[in-house]
Amino acid sequence: MSFEGARLSMRSRRNGTMGSTRTLYSSVSRSTDVSYSDSDLVNFIQANFKKRECVFFTRDSKAMENICKCGYAQSQHIEGTQINQNEKWNYKKHTKEFPTDAFGDIQFETLGKKGKYLRLSCDTDSETLYELLTQHWHLKTPNLVISVTGGAKNFALKPRMRKIFSRLIYIAQSKGAWILTGGTHYGLMKYIGEVVRDNTISRNSEENIVAIGIAAWGMVSNRDTLIRSCDDEGHFSAQYIMDDFTRDPLYILDNNHTHLLLVDNGCHGHPTVEAKLRNQLEKYISERTSQDSNYGGKIPIVCFAQGGGRETLKAINTSVKSKIPCVVVEGSGQIADVIASLVEVEDVLTSSMVKEKLVRFLPRTVSRLPEEEIESWIKWLKEILESSHLLTVIKMEEAGDEIVSNAISYALYKAFSTNEQDKDNWNGQLKLLLEWNQLDLASDEIFTNDRRWESADLQEVMFTALIKDRPKFVRLFLENGLNLQKFLTNEVLTELFSTHFSTLVYRNLQIAKNSYNDALLTFVWKLVANFRRSFWKEDRSSREDLDVELHDASLTTRHPLQALFIWAILQNKKELSKVIWEQTKGCTLAALGASKLLKTLAKVKNDINAAGESEELANEYETRAVELFTECYSNDEDLAEQLLVYSCEAWGGSNCLELAVEATDQHFIAQPGVQNFLSKQWYGEISRDTKNWKIILCLFIIPLVGCGLVSFRKKPIDKHKKLLWYYVAFFTSPFVVFSWNVVFYIAFLLLFAYVLLMDFHSVPHTPELILYALVFVLFCDEVRQWYMNGVNYFTDLWNVMDTLGLFYFIAGIVFRLHSSNKSSLYSGRVIFCLDYIIFTLRLIHIFTVSRNLGPKIIMLQRMLIDVFFFLFLFAVWMVAFGVARQGILRQNEQRWRWIFRSVIYEPYLAMFGQVPSDVDSTTYDFSHCTFSGNESKPLCVELDEHNLPRFPEWITIPLVCIYMLSTNILLVNLLVAMFGYTVGIVQENNDQVWKFQRYFLVQEYCNRLNIPFPFVVFAYFYMVVKKCFKCCCKEKNMESNACCFRNEDNETLAWEGVMKENYLVKINTKANDNSEEMRHRFRQLDSKLNDLKSLLKEIANNIK
């Protein structure tokens, strides 16, 4: 008989009635790079996969109708079927293979996504089937296979069991696993499908779960809808109907499985036909090696069993014989409970003991079994228990989120470590435990005293631990001999920054670099770009970035630990970055650098949650820097102060103070050690014990310096030049320079005021010329600051004010030079007066150094910001009232000056209590206005026919009342509340904020030339001349020594490393103490609860 004829004959088979439909959700398979056309897929399936047809009719004597032992009626057999009367029916002898006629996509009731299905012979080769799954159905090679068995009949799923299944599906999704089930819409398979659906809906569609159902073709209801017609030569989509309400003994397929394999042995209504092919496929996968496997080359497979009867027992027995580990859920009933109870037996396992357990957990089933069948069950159970190392039992009542994953990982490890081939494969075992994050197992079973690990042995798993963010494993590898310095080669760092670095993080880094133009950000961006350059070559749009390269490419080879730390920090790997931080040199600098990077990136992140995480991690590193520096400072003040000024090229050449200020780490700057260091800088060689009034007195009576009124921190070496040294040390002190500048700045302001009020003539007199000279010195100082700071100069508000003041002064001089014109001379004087305000306000900045005035000035700055917000709200009310008032009172005012007064100025004055008088007709005075608009008076209000004000008082007066109420009561009190909140915030951190602001003033005067104002102008001329000579001679710059190579740096860093270890020990000790305290509290609470229970029992007994 031909293949077409057989296929047409099969179309007439009866497969049950159709019923109601049900909604579905089906996952789609994950694709790989391999792609085949539909015709290639059809040709491959038809050439390699078969169906089976009964070709010998053997009448079943037990059946009422003319039914063959294959389950089909004689009319349902293909043409040419022979009659068999004597022989016992056997599928191998009495069926024949034909090319399969049922494959393609399966659509359940026209809803949901499509799945794949295939009808195949029970003798199909596992290798061919695996090729179909991976190469033609485009499934990725699994990292794990979970074979779920048990509970094929309908049963009520307990909430705890549903939680276990949900965790099982989550594991499958996160590990890239295949799930193998029976594939039908009954019992356990139905619940597994529902959990698959829920997880697929709730998670990213790119992480679809692969759920493969393997069912018997002869047990599938409505299977005629799956058979392709003769005309379907290419793609075929079967519309499968789920008649869930029929009482047909056949099963319907589950709509939530992604792939369905329907095993055919030519029978109808015969269950468990698929068991053999399923076991063979599992064994083939478990023995197959894969280069991409995370478990030492093998694809692990685990059997997950719950409940179940005979077939579940056989499946577990077959899995154990194939060296496949099994996880059994105790409490799920039936066979699972039998096995779980027998595993706990320590004595020799006897048949009577096994039978007792069977009777206990399966009383009805065992009572119906013949004795021979019971013996078979006992034999299978004994065979399973002989390989008890392959069994792992979890209790359903104790199952939590981690119980399932721990059980699977432990089962895989036991199977792996006891396998003759793999028991000495330590690398493979370690990979398995690393994949499942089983640190305790790795510590107890692998890293023992019996084995000595070389650094090279751990490098591969170390790389995996880094990319999988396993900080505890990284620490474990470091503790067991991994040399991180040797591991971090340029190739490893390139792989980390290119393949395992988020593109979004890189974009945010680039945005931050462009937005803030910061030295550290620029350096880090170049560091990352240097590693990613090879990927840019493939991107035409980034061709312009090909020239990005570090100034010194050897930086990464000299500082690989810092590069790895930056990689972890940029990607917010919180715990991993802490482990790496502990290994770096210059931990204080690294912690502050991390705080700086994280806070800057948080500002450019669009995701609020991600930005919050970065801020939180930045604060943690600031805290670490504070605590570590405190530990260092308490041990040795001098070495701790050296840490503050230690700079490293791996952090853009910045030091701790610079990074802390750029990151606004106020808590670090406010530390006593940092403030003491700033005080030393502030006073220079002058002892801090010297009172400020003594220093100021010496400014006016200079000879007192050599009389011992001022004490110094050290004595001069040359006693003959002792007096000279005292004077030099005194006048080069930043505090003295500051005090001198304050005195002369006040004198400058007094001179400026004198010129404006008493000596401003058409021809400048001597005081005015002296004023010009002093402003020129100020101008030179601002040019120097601009030259030193570059574009960052204008980020300081005070620098902007200085520039504005100088600009106004130059503008005033320009008008002043036209003294022949009195109008121009007056304009110049007005500009000078306005400029005087700016120069006077500049005096506020000088007093930020004061502990008392400094915080008040900061409050004032913050309150100015509140005023701007208030003015915005006030402007809304003011303009609304002003325009309405002007429009009601007057018609067609053409003078802009008077429009401004009426709309803006007068409503503004009303906020301060000046009530408008032109809204009440009874008090309106026409002598204060003009009808024509030719006088310098406001336009009179519009009149009616009786020459009375036309405006309605019932509108204007309530309008004024509402406006006064809104502005004088609501808005003013809002401003007061805002001020109160701002003052409260500053007051909470009063000392910290002042200390942070003090840093800028100290650094400003420390970086200035130590020459008093105004004599510093001569030094400026000298610097300009010297710079010109350098440009002419073109002297070659000597290369600076790289950091961490100077002896003093190495000694300081080595000492900091010791302090870091002390600090970490204290942290761990404190954590252990807290844990012990919590345990003690729990014990106390438990004791109190027991006492309470006893008391309640006594009360209950007394009541009875």
From Swiss-Prot:
Q: What is the effect of changing residue 934 to K?
A: Reduced ion channel sensitivity to cold stimuli or menthol plus cold stimuli
Coiled coil stretches, renumbered: 1069-1104
Residues in the bilayer without spanning it = 896-912
The tissues in which it is expressed are: Expressed in dorsal root and trigeminal ganglia. Specifically expressed in a subset of pain- and temperature-sensing neurons. Not expressed in heavily myelinated neurons. Not expressed in neurons expressing TRPA1 or TRPV1.
Membrane-crossing segments per the record: 734-758, 766-789, 797-817, 823-848, 854-890, 954-984
UniProt GO MF annotations: calcium channel activity; identical protein binding; monoatomic ion channel activity
The ranges of region (Disordered) come to 1-22
Source organism's superkingdom? Eukaryota
Q: Which sequence ranges are listed under topological domain Extracellular?
A: 759-765, 818-822, 891-895, 913-953
Reactions accelerated catalytically: Ca(2+)(in) = Ca(2+)(out); Na(+)(in) = Na(+)(out); K(+)(in) = K(+)(out)
Subcellular localization, as worded in the UniProt entry: Cell membrane; Membrane raft
Keyword set, alphabetical order:
Cell membrane, Coiled coil, Glycoprotein, Ion channel, Ion transport, Membrane, Sensory transduction, Transmembrane, Transmembrane helix, Transport
User: Post-translational modification, briefly?
Assistant: N-glycosylation is not essential for but facilitates cell surface expression, multimerization, association with lipid rafts and ion channel activity.
Q: Which parts of the sequence bind Ca(2+)?
A: 782, 785, 799, 802
- Outcome after substituting residue 934 to D: Slighty reduced ion channel sensitivity to cold stimuli. No significant effect on ion channel sensitivity to menthol plus cold stimuli
Q: Which GO terms describe its biological process?
A: calcium ion transport; intracellular calcium ion homeostasis; positive regulation of cold-induced thermogenesis; response to cold; response to temperature stimulus; thermoception
Domain description = Cooling agents bind within a pocket formed entirely by the S1-S4 helices that opens to the cytoplasm. The coiled coil region is required for multimerization.
Q: How does it assemble?
A: Homotetramer. Interacts (via N-terminus and C-terminus domains) with TCAF1; the interaction stimulates TRPM8 channel activity. Interacts (via N-terminus and C-terminus domains) with TCAF2; the interaction inhibits TRPM8 channel activity.
Matches recorded under PANTHER family: TRANSIENT RECEPTOR POTENTIAL CATION CHANNEL SUBFAMILY M MEMBER 8, TRANSIENT RECEPTOR POTENTIAL CATION CHANNEL, SUBFAMILY M, MEMBER 6
What family does the database annotate?
Belongs to the transient receptor (TC 1.A.4) family. LTrpC subfamily. TRPM8 sub-subfamily.
Q: What is this protein called?
A: Transient receptor potential cation channel subfamily M member 8
- Taxonomic placement: Eukaryota, Metazoa, Chordata, Craniata, Vertebrata
* Gene from which this protein is expressed: Trpm8
